[in-house]
Amino acid sequence: MAETMFDRVGGYSTINRVARAFFEKVPTSNFIASYFEDSDFTGLIRHHTEFLGSIMGGPTRYSNKDLEQIHRFMDITDAAFDEMVELMKDSFYQFHFEQADVNFIEDELLRRRRFICGSK
């Protein structure tokens, strides 16, 4: 069986550090900070770690329906989504992820845009 990106990068331990780095950037963003005001960052970091792990071949799965339900009433704009993707990419680069891996993760995030953006 081929090794997944999840396994190759060190699993949840590494991905959790990336998620923490992302959430350290959130308060400085003009586009996304307001979506996370009064949020439980501990829980968000855990969920983002699991979600990113799922994209990378880890054991947890998030369906498009799950994503849609989670973000249903957040009214996330395309500009905010784009900012999230850029901050996420920066966080992966901060931990020296390879360009091809970051490109793959970016593509997977962009593929899920319609399940995350807008009001439902």
Question: Where would I find each of the regions flagged by the language model?
Answer:
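Core of compact, soluble alpha-helical bundle domains
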Residues: 1-120
